[in-house]
Amino acid sequence: MTLAPSVYAQETSAIVRGAVSTSSGEPLAGATVMVTSNTTGVTKTVTTDAGGFYSVRGLPAGVAYDITVDANGWQKASTASLSLAVGQSEVMNYRLDAEEEVIVVGTRVAMDTAVGPSAVFNLASLQDSPSVNRNITDVIQQDPRLYVDQSSGTDAVQCNGANPRYNSLTVDGVRLNDGFGLNSNGYPTQRMPFPYDAISSVAVELAPMDVVYGGFSACNINAVTKTGSNELFGSIFFDYGSDSLRGDKLEGDNIASQDYDETRWGMELGGAIIPDTLFFYGAYEKYDGADLNNRGAIGSGAINEVPVAQADLDEIARIAREVYGYEPGRTASEAFDFEDEKYLLKADWYINDAHRLSVTYMYNDSFNFTPSDGDLDEFEFDKHFYKRGAELTTYNVNWYADWNDRFSTEIRYSLNDVDFLQQAVGGKDFAEFRVELDEVDVYLGQDDSRQANEMNYEIEQLVARGSYTLNNHTITAGFEREDMQIYNLFYQHVDTEVRFDGIENFAAGQAARVYYGNAISNNEQDAAVDWGYAVNTLYLQDEWQINDRLAVTLGLRYEWYESSDKPNVNPDFVADYGFSNDANLDNLDMILPRFGFTWDASDAITVRGGIGLFSGGNPNVWYSNVFSNTNTTAVQTQIRGVDLFAQEYVNCEASAPQCGPGWGVPKQLAEQVAAGDGSNFEIVYLDPDFDAPTEWKYSLGMTWEFGDGYVLTADALMTRGNDTAIYKHGDLDFTGEVNDFGNGYPVYDSARIPTFVLTNSSKGNESESLAFSLFKSFDAGLDIRFGYAWTDAKDVNPMTSSVAFSNYVNRAFYDPEEEVLSTSNYNIEHRFTGVLNYTANWFGEYRTQVSLYGQAASGVPYSTVLGGADGTIAAYGFTPYLDFIEHVLEAPGTRNNNNGSWWRKVDMRISQEFPGFSDSHRGSAFLIVDNLTNLLNDDWGVMYKANFPYGVTQDDINDGRAETRRGTPSLWEIRVGFNYRF
């Protein structure tokens, strides 16, 4: 891993540029520069201009190159095996001597130019790291600024304390982040959507001062896939895990676990169809795994015991079967089996010395099983879980052209199609039943949010850019267009939700409430929305190599939105608010300046810095809420205090054992919906004055090579947000009064139709961070790296969710309409990382390797809040719009005022090579231990974290119940396997 200050753009290629001079320092015009790939043998040749400058662009990344410089009357100069990472702009200056040939050996990814803090992970890092999940997140977390949240199994990447949804992921130039915004892992699918072995290098940029960067405000994760070569190569791998290779004790407590087996296998193959001209590469990976249910009743021994007796659960199950004719499923679930299949195909055609065409196809079909209601005060039967997944298909075509020694272009077209899946385990024929007990709510049936839930989207991207080298200037200009089309059906309660106050009422059929929502036609498909928008981008940039030691990048990026789709106009909204609810993203625009510099202060010290404005990353689901929640085509209704068996029912499935409660819709509710009557959800609208959020990034860093091969890297980064997106209640007016409870809470009146508005905060999110890294490679086969990052990130609203209501309430506040900067949910104040790689040849030429990765991180912050009646009655009274238990702060400005517990963990990978079927083949057996610390001692490596949304009462703090133990990241796990490379 390299903490690199180089340029890593959202592209798939690399650049070599520089100047050629005589031994006396005079520019050497007309010198020939040849760059030859070690894998394909393809050579690019250019000549230096009058100032001695040259530039070779469009080089495939992730491979090594030989460089030869030749000029009449001068000896040759050469560089051997220079490794170029994705998007890297490498400066190689040569002075030709009249007496002897100059040979410069490149053995690492060099760090000569800089536009911002970043981290680079080459093929060796990807192959040798203890990646138990075969996911690039296992590797990039070695950078102390990149925290991977393992508490819930999503492995969301938090860059510098920012919301993971604000990241961007690109693979071979295709944007592969979550295009809609439902997944906290940042992927469009449940897991990494491409085979792990297909990646040759990964770069993570936090503040890249280059105009080609866009679509994010947190960080950009840029991966490049492998390509074929003249030599046929490939590999096969297999690994295995099971419950017998997983821990069963934490802090002296025996932990019950379901039986399971997991296997992964895959292969890759690359080579030449026509040597030196046409190359192919393909990779495949299959994962047959298990999702574990970590929850159980009191005394079950589950990782997380819920405060409910097994006898109560058994009684609820009996009633469901005998009274309602419904089989709810199990309470002590077996593991859910899932599949994940992915493959990648790629072809590279070197049409001639000046033109290259690259075509990539990716496919992933994956799913897992997810709890619908999994808080500590909730319990669900296993049929209430849901199957969550996506099918991804991606096409990408890149054309690189060198029109002469000065001018090169790249044209790229990509298509990304995602079909999302959310499906109740128990099927769609039964309602959601919720039995409310003293300390816990018990759920059975079909989750209300899965009853009408379909989504797919398509993203088309066109990129056209060109670069022209003029003396010591490289001018880059380009146009990009990204067009997104979304189909979204999300409407709750179409098969009803029924709530019961206690088991006795459940048995008697006496419901406290019955909810029903649907399109006015009573056909749920009519509640769907189909909308889209496009983002256009123009940019211009000058990379100016002022002299051998100073380079400056100065550019301007302009983005503007287009959309002809508008939300349905709600006439009641217009009458109440005096303006329409049909605002959209059309005509939003922004100018994004970028400036960066690299200064070689000495042969050992490089200083870098920059200032830039960035935009993008806001989930499209926030904008989609505006289309889905107009209350014009669909209606929510409810009835209270219902004798279920006295109702007449409609819309029953033909296969239902009875047309009664749970199996159908009460006729009176269906008629209310058909008439358009009911108490709707809040309308969601976009502020007519909404501006696209942007964020300034200011960076300053240095790299110092000292002593016997030590490399010290330091980076400072500051961000300041503008027009940060938040949700507010559009209908609330401050009365000018305060409640006499506590410190005096503001009193609001809901004077209009209840609404949520997606608007801009008057205070933007902000952060400061410092990061350090020290690396040393020893002759004895030992490489060591230590890193540390300090981060102070603040936001007004963490914006944790997909829907407007959840984003508004899932935070702690004193004033629900406040815009107060407070410590972010995503802030990890202190984080230490360490990487140790040891390689030895104890068995002849066959390599033995031990890799260790360790981290120590301060915990997730949480808030001190009011509890029970204080949070719902005393502070705000009985109001339908401020009924927030566990969300109200005790004092103003104290959100996330408590520090979470530290988490310390070490992972390990051990591998041993063995001979293959020929001299050039190698086999390898490996063992990966996730959380070696917990394997050594069950008191170690244990994670504690407050429950979402991180509000804790003072009584909980005093009693030591502020945080709960997280079983999945705390328990050790082992993977054993082998691979064979040729």
Where are the language model's segments positioned?
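Short loop/turn motifs that connect adjacent beta-strands in outer-membrane beta-barrel proteins
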Residues: V211-G214, G228-F233, I274-T277, A354, ...
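Gram-negative outer-membrane beta-barrel transporters
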Residues: G709, T713-P861
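C-terminal beta-signal and adjacent terminal beta-strands/loops
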Residues: G709, S802, F843-H887, G900-D907, ...
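Periplasm-facing N-terminal accessory domains of Gram-negative outer-membrane beta-barrel systems
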Residues: Y8-I103
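Transmembrane beta-barrel wall of Gram-negative outer-membrane proteins
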Residues: F233, Q258-F367, K387-T409, Y413, ...
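Solvent-exposed loop/turn elements at secondary-structure boundaries
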Residues: K566-L592, G596-L758, I885, S901
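Periplasmic N-terminal accessory/gating domains of Gram-negative outer-membrane beta-barrel systems
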Residues: D49, W74-K76, A80-R95, I103-T227, ...
